């Protein structure tokens, strides 16, 4: 007869159970937006001197979040008294030049005494005196250059300039 059928060389078995793979789940679900708190502050101040001759104006603002931190400050100093003190009034005076000459009249009268025939002429002014002109000293004031300072701390790095 017939020979029994030979068993196959490879035997198949039922599929094994699927293993469970897990990754570390995020702390924040991606379906819900993150509402991170932010802390802010701002302040402004103007300090004036007596008679409003000078003032210092300051303004500052900060914003802090878990991810970043920002700080801005603006300080301005003004002193209009310096501007007026530097520009002193200038007084200039020059005496007028003498242009008229005076000559005394000649004596023509005769006396019993000897006759005077000489004429007298007053000296003519040759030079006029002019006072020196006061000159201003050239002092120029300009605004202070803008200064910016920035700091950043995050992602393992800190920068400042």
UniProtKB/Swiss-Prot annotation:
Entry remark concerning the domains of this protein: The tetrapeptide (A-A-P-[AV]) repeats found throughout the protein are also present in many proteins constituting the protective envelope of other species.
Record function comment: Component of the cuticle of the pupa of Tenebrio molitor.
UniProt keyword terms in alphabetical order: Cuticle, Repeat
Domain of life, source organism: Eukaryota
Keyword Iron-sulfur annotated: no
MF terms in GO: structural constituent of cuticle
Disulfide bonds: none
Name listed for the protein in its UniProt record: Pupal cuticle protein C1B
Sequence-type repeats, residues: 6-9, 14-17, 35-38, 87-90, 103-106, 112-115, 121-124, 130-133, 143-146
Classification via Pfam families: Cuticle_3
Protein's UniProt keywords contain Membrane: no
């Amino acid at each position: 007869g017939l020979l029994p059928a030979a068993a196959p060389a490879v035997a198949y078995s039922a599929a094994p159970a699927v293993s469970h793979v897990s990754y570390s789940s995020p702390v924040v679900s991606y379906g819900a937006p993150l509402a991170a708190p932010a802390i802010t502050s701002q302040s402004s101040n103007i300090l004036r001197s007596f008679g409003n001759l000078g003032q210092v104006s300051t303004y500052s603002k900060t914003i802090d979040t878990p991810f970043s931190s920002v700080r801005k400050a603006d300080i301005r100093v003004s002193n209009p008294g310096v501007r007026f003190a530097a520009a002193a009034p200038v007084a200039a005076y020059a005496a007028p030049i003498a242009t008229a000459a005076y000559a005394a009249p000649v004596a023509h009268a005769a006396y019993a005494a000897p006759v005077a025939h000489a004429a007298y002429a007053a000296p003519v002014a040759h030079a006029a005196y002019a006072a020196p002109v006061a000159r201003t000293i050239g002092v120029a004031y300009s605004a202070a250059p803008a200064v910016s300072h920035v700091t950043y701390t995050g992602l393992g790095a800190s920068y400042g300039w």
